[in-house]
Amino acid sequence: MSALTKIREGLAREDNTHVAGTLAPHEKEIHETPEVVSEVGPDHDKEATAGAINPDDKGNDSDVPSEDVQNGVKEIQAITLTWGKGSLAALLCLIWTLFLISGFRGSFYLVLVPYVTSEWSAHSLMTTIPIVSDAMTAACYIPMAKALDVWGRAEGFLLMSGFATLGLILMAVSQNLATFCAAQVFYSVGWGGMIYAVGVLAADASNLRNRGLAFAFTSSPYMITAFAGSKAAAAFVIDVKNWRWGFGWIALVLPCVTIPLFLVLKVNLRKAFKNGTVTKTTRNRGFFGSIWWAFNEFDVIGIFLFGGGLVVFLLPFNLAGHAPNGWSTGYIIAMIIVGFCTLIFFGVWEYWLAPVPFLQGRFLLDRSVVAACMIDLTYQVSYYTWNYFFTSFLQVVVNLGPAEAGYVNSTFQVVSGVLLFIVGFLIRKTGFYKWTFYFAVPIYIFALGLMIHFRAPNQYVGYIIMCEIFISIGGAVFILVMQLAVLAAVAHQYVAAALATLYVAGGVGGAVGGAISGAIWTNSFIPQLIKRLPESEVANATLIAGSIVNQLAYPVDSPARLAIQESYGFAQIRMLAAGVGIASLFFIWVPMLRNIDVKKLKQTKGLVL
């Protein structure tokens, strides 16, 4: 069956699992202490959380998929009940390879984007791109979750990989900043959705107890790409002298992994249909009926209100410094007002008017899910307030080459690749995860504050790497445990939706962080540059700010280069100070988490990790 046929059938399926305010029949009453959730009732009815969200009961090792779940969940359960160890190993290897490509993609992006924007004299607008792409990506996670649950994991994954490939091709052939920004939206939505779908697959193919190790496994390729990716990206800048081939290479390689992964899922699903493990359930709504159903089910109006409102509201904070009259410019004021009103109307639409709300109410009422989402939001904002210009800072201020700057900025990938296995193993042994935040949060905030001290021009790079290592320790724990906390609080049928809610929070955080970073940059770097440049170079301030190539053209220790470095330091200190202030919110969110014992819970069926 083709993917297109599958999608058409998915549009015709009846969605029998809309969120209800009451518990499902299989959900049992539980009690919790402030720190540990305990279960009551027989062993086969143990649940994870109280309130509106409950996971599957412990004894769900039956040889048939659950009946009270959506079609995509039923199909993935049928796959895990049907496949053998070879198929499971093939899936895990393909996921690992996909994350290897993702690591190269991330390294390429960090190193190449400063040169991409500089080609069009738009280095100062570097944060504009992620504001738009992150906001639109955040708006697409919830519909993506519904696609995975209604159409199926394989179809949703293939659709997103298609968007990612298209975006990469458009980035490679773009000839101006506007085209590159549009390509970045396709790429970001597709890549983010693809990685999200793989995250859901990793949850489908692993027990909750081993999920930390599963996520650590998928992150391990980053230890390779932290060095190889940065070196390869530098080669495109220095040797090939064409950044477009960096994105083009990823576009060529990506289908070589995504198509086999899609086929592994489809082949095993076909076996499940043949064996009678699962049967096809369809309802004929007709073409226009299916279109109308999809329009409402995927909340298309909500997507555009949320994504568009967020973009229009956040962009002025980045553009005001370039506007003719600054903050008093008419279109800057209009964008802020229109964006804010659009976000208000989005709330009104979702609460009173939307046929199927964008976010599920049951998740918004569970304190553990809310806490994990707020931790993710806080982490992304605090991290991206300073990180977008970090690679440029390392080259211009610390005098590193593109490859070496990529190595330093990839410290997170190396540290997390090792640390995640350790944390995942400890969680597997203890069954609890909340304790990891008690050392991760102080380390992260301390390192972020310490980084402020090492932002002076020509500072010893070893101190910066030391701070990066500590920041990476905290960040790696956040990324792993946030996902685990959300997944431990829901049943298998809600895994995709719960992860999507977490990803929405992260996407919004990235967009807000980019807006703060851009606002600080445009309102501090350029004024300081004009103030500090030698008289003979003041007329070139705009050209210098717009291109990293122009910045690097001035010799080290020359008056102009020192002025540029001091301006970078001035802006970076304020970016980091904002990050530290925002990170202090962790102390509010962490106590809200429930300390669920994942050793006693089981969500999946069949042969899993």
From Swiss-Prot:
It is a multi-pass membrane protein. Residues 1-17, 25-34 have a biased composition (Basic and acidic residues). GO terms for cellular component: plasma membrane. Keywords: Cell membrane, Ion transport, Iron, Iron transport, Membrane, Transmembrane, Transmembrane helix, Transport. Signal peptide: none annotated. Induction: Not expressed during infection. Residues 1-69 are annotated as: Disordered. GO terms for molecular function: transmembrane transporter activity. The chain crosses the membrane at residues 81-101, 125-145, 154-174, 182-202, 220-240, 245-265, 300-320, 329-349, 368-390, 407-427, 432-452, 469-489, 496-516, 573-593. The keyword Cell division does not apply. Major facilitator transporter involved in extracellular siderophore uptake. Gibberella zeae produces extracellular coprogen-type siderophores as well as the intracellular siderophore ferricrocin. The role of extracellular siderophores is to supply iron to the fungus during plant infection, and the intracellular ferricrocin is required for intracellular iron distribution and storage with a crucial role in ascus and ascospore development. Belongs to the major facilitator superfamily. This is MFS siderochrome iron transporter 1. It comes from Gibberella zeae (strain ATCC MYA-4620 / CBS 123657 / FGSC 9075 / NRRL 31084 / PH-1) (Wheat head blight fungus). The gene is MIR1.
